[in-house]
A protein has these predicted regions:
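Internal alpha-helical scaffold of NAD(P)-dependent oxidoreductase catalytic cores
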Residues: 65, 72-85, 132-133, 139-148, ...
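Glycine-rich phosphate/diphosphate-binding loop of Rossmann-like nucleotide-binding domains
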Residues: 170, 174-244
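Short glycine-/small-residue-rich Rossmann-like dinucleotide-binding loops
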Residues: 249-251, 279-280
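Glycine/serine-rich phosphate-binding loop and adjoining beta1-alpha1 elements at the start
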Residues: 83-181
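Short active-site oxyanion
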Residues: 45, 206-209, 271-274
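A glycine-rich (often HGG/GG-containing) alpha/beta subdomain
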Residues: 1-109
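Adenosine-phosphate binding glycine-rich loop
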Residues: 21-30, 262-341
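Rossmann-fold NAD(P) dinucleotide-binding segment
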Residues: 195, 238-243, 252-275
Length: 341
């Protein structure tokens, strides 16, 4: 019996960040998570993608109906009690291949044309290989998704002047103030997202302060972006002095809590503080948004800014969709050759 593809997942299109963060898996946990999912031996292959805007489990099996239920159960058990499992979507067969081609090419991203997703898909691919859950079908499917994404970038203008979640966060900060020049921006986190935000902020003339648990990483990033590194112990002082805060760490727990922010709010003397949280799981406790003169935005609040970018890319996205259908035909031909063999 021929094996077939199944994907079960959720994304920014089906679930808000307060649900997505419950399913998020840190990059260094992907392999272990896959081993646990595949432990019952009922799935032939498995691959897990986890980003700030999506969590998707790809599997193959000779019994796709049973595989769908296994994959759904693996994700649904981590949903919060208040969430309905209809936030999870499912695809089977060739629709799964089309879906991952679109995901890798950033056509299903919050920000169409953003460059980070391809690296995240490759990271998931490597984790599946490391976990021993990658086989012929997923291997070919994902390898071809990388080639498809490369064609889309090379043959369309979808990435011209491209923006990312991080740069949209900076765009939002500029919209709030009109101009960031001379304003103090505190960046908490010096990982990939933080680095992308720092690069965008560098062009605004803001007074950039970078804080990270690893002071060495904070210093390296600050020096490369004409900013200033600050010891983590000065977090509350920096929060008291900042005009805008962009936070993106890999912490599994909230970084900014009401308890921490209480003294910050008091010392600011009614001066408003704008916090943009681009981490998933979130770095800012939702209760912070209820505090006086504190305004919190999360990744879902970036949607409106992203949609302004979408109209510009609509024509290029149509060209990209044609490339995906061509690559899908090529993949289908490869599958048929396996059946004949």
């Amino acid at each position: 019996m021929m094996r077939d593809f199944v994907v079960v997942g959720l994304s920014h299109r089906t679930a808000p960040v307060e649900i997505r963060e419950h399913l998020a898996v840190a990059p260094d946990r992907l392999e272990q998570e896959l081993r646990e999912i595949a432990a019952n031996g009922r799935l032939d292959e498995a691959l897990l993608i986890s980003t700030c805007n999506r969590v998707e489990l790809y599997v193959t099996s000779a019994n796709p109906i049973a595989a769908s239920q296994i994959a759904k159960d693996a994700l649904a058990k981590r949903l919060p009690e208040a969430a309905d499992d209809d936030v999870l979507y499912q695809e089977r067969g060739i629709d799964v291949v089309r879906h991952i081609f679109r995901v890798a090419s950033s056509l299903d991203s919050l920000v169409i044309g953003e460059p980070q997703i391809l690296g995240q898909v490759k990271e998931a691919f490597d984790a599946a290989k490391g976990a021993g859950t990658m086989g012929t079908l997923l291997g070919r499917c994902f390898t071809q998704s990388f080639a498809t994404a490369k064609r889309v970038r090379n043959e369309t203008g979808i990435a011209e002047g491209t923006v990312s979640v991080s740069s949209i966060a900076c765009e939002l900060a500029k919209k709030i103030f009109g101009n960031l020049e001379g304003r103090r921006t505190l960046l908490i986190g010096a990982g990939e997202m933080g680095e992308a935000a720092a690069r965008s902020l560098q062009q605004t003339g803001t007074n950039l302060h970078v804080i990270n648990r690893s002071e060495e990483r904070a210093r390296a990033l600050a020096e490369s972006c004409a900013g200033r590194a600050v010891p983590y112990e000065r977090l509350t002082t920096e929060l008291a002095d900042a005009d805008v805060v962009i936070v993106s760490t890999a912490s599994p727990k909230f970084i900014l809590t009401p308890e921490l922010m209480k003294s910050v709010v008091r010392s600011r003397r009614r001066r408003p503080l704008f916090i943009i949280d681009i981490a998933v799981p979130r770095d800012v406790d939702p209760r912070v948004a209820n505090m006086d003169n504190v305004f919190v935005y999360d990744v879902d609040d970036l949607q409106q800014v992203a949609e302004e970018n979408l109209a510009v890319r609509a024509r290029e996205a149509a060209l990209a969709e044609r490339i995906i259908e061509e690559e899908l035909d090529a993949f289908s031909a490869w599958r048929r050759s396996l059946e004949l063999a």
